[in-house]
Regions:
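Cleavable N-terminal export/targeting peptides
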Residues: 1-26
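Residue-level signature of outer-membrane beta-barrel architecture
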Residues: 96-98, 156-158, 231-233, 296
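Repeated loop/turn-to-beta-strand initiation elements of outer-membrane beta-barrel proteins
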Residues: 100-103, 162, 237-241
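Extracellular/periplasm-exposed beta-strand and loop segments of Gram-negative cell-envelope proteins
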Residues: 38-85, 109-149, 158, 176-222, ...
Length: 298
C-alpha cells in the first residue's frame, strides 16, 4: 500500500532529522495560498429501502405483493461518477531546518468545487427493474468538497542553505476531515400507464410523479499522504518566498446514515417501524495543488 510506504519513509527520515540535529538548526513558520485541481470523483450510495410494492404508505393493504415483502430485502446500491473539480487552498506550517533536511507540521484547508451532475448507475435487481418502467430520472449532484487536514512532512533541500535559490522535494503523511454536499434525485413517471409496478390503476396513479430526494452534507475523516516539490528564493537573512507543487491522495471516506428528504413524496419510511436511511461513500480522492509560500526563519 502506498500510504504505508510513505509512513515508513517519513518515519525513517524523521529519525534522521533528530539524530542529525545541531546547534545551527532553525525554526520557521510558513504561510501559503494556492489553487487545486482534482481528478474525477466517484460516489457510491446505499440504503435500506424496500420495493415500492412493500411501501405500506403507498400500498397499506399489501396488494399484489405475494411473498415479496415477507422479509427485508438486500440493501440497494447505486453510483454517481462526477467530473473534475478545482478550487483554492491555504496552509500554515511550523518546522525545523537542519541544513539539508527539514521536519514540518502543516495545517491545510482546501475547497474544491465540482458543481456537477451525473446520471445514477444502479446495481441491485429491485431498483434496476423499476428503472425500466417506474423511474423516469435518476441522478446525483455534488457541489463543494471542503476539508481541514494536518500533515507531518519531511523535506530534502538541494544546495547550500545560504544559496539564493533552494529547490527541494518532500513527502508527508496525515489526514483530513472532509465535507461534501451531495444530492440524489429519483423521479417517477408522471404517466401511470407507463408504470408496471402495479396492475391496479389506482396504485399506479398513487406512485406516478412521486420523487425520492436526498440532500446530505456528507462528512468523514480519512488518512492520506502527499508528495511535494518546490523552490524557495531568499529575500533576506530570515525571509524566503517560494512556489510549491503537491500531489495529495486520501483514502475513501464514508458519511453517516442520513434520512431521505422525501421518499416517494412522503416521509423517509415505508411504515414498517424503521426509518429509511442512506449512506454515501467516495472512492479514494486526491488533488494537485500549486501555491505560493512565504517562510520566516526565527
Amino acid at each position: 500500500m502506498m500510504l504505508r510506504r510513505v509512513v515508513l519513509a517519513v518515519g525513517a527520515m524523521s529519525m534522521g532529522c533528530v539524530s542529525g540535529a545541531s546547534a545551527q538548526s532553525n525554526r520557521y513558520i510558513e504561510m501559503g495560498l494556492g489553487v487545486n485541481a482534482a481528478p474525477p470523483l466517484v460516489a457510491h450510495g446505499s440504503d435500506n429501502d424496500w420495493s415500492t410494492k412493500c411501501d405500506l404508505i403507498i400500498n397499506p393493504l399489501g396488494l399484489e405483493t405475494g411473498g415479496e415483502c415477507d422479509s427485508a430485502p438486500p440493501r440497494t446500491s447505486w453510483t454517481n461518477a462526477f467530473g473534475r473539480g478545482n478550487g483554492f487552498g491555504a496552509g500554515l506550517a511550523i518546522g525545523y531546518d537542519w541544513g539539508a533536511v527539514r521536519l514540518e507540521l502543516e495545517y491545510l484547508y482546501r475547497s474544491t468545487a465540482y458543481d456537477d451532475r451525473s446520471d445514477t448507475d444502479i446495481f441491485d435487481d429491485v431498483t434496476l427493474d423499476k428503472r425500466e418502467q417506474e423511474i423516469e430520472q435518476a441522478y446525483g449532484e455534488i457541489d463543494d468538497l471542503r476539508s481541514h487536514g494536518a500533515f507531518v512532512n519531511v523535506y530534502y533541500d538541494f544546495g547550500p542553505s545560504i544559496a539564493s535559490w533552494t529547490p527541494y522535494v518532500g513527502v508527508g503523511v496525515g489526514g483530513e476531515r472532509a465535507t461534501l454536499d451531495y444530492r440524489s434525485v429519483w423521479k417517477r413517471n408522471d404517466d401511470p400507464e407507463r408504470i408496471s409496478t402495479f396492475m391496479d390503476p389506482l396504485l399506479r396513479a398513487k406512485v406516478a410523479g412521486t420523487t425520492t430526494i436526498g440532500n446530505a452534507r456528507v462528512s468523514g475523516s480519512t488518512l492520506g499522504y502527499q508528495l511535494l516539490a518546490g523552490v524557495d528564493y531568499r529575500l533576506g537573512e530570515r525571509a524566503m518566498l517560494g512556489v510549491k507543487l503537491r500531489w495529495v491522495d486520501f483514502e475513501a471516506f464514508e458519511g453517516g446514515e442520513t434520512l431521505w428528504s422525501q421518499l416517494r413524496s412522503h416521509e423517509s419510511s415505508v411504515g414498517r417501524g424503521e426509518d429509511i436511511r442512506y449512506t454515501v461513500t467516495t472512492d479514494d480522492n486526491g488533488y494537485w495543488g500549486l501555491g505560493v509560500n512565504l517562510k520566516y526563519l526565527f
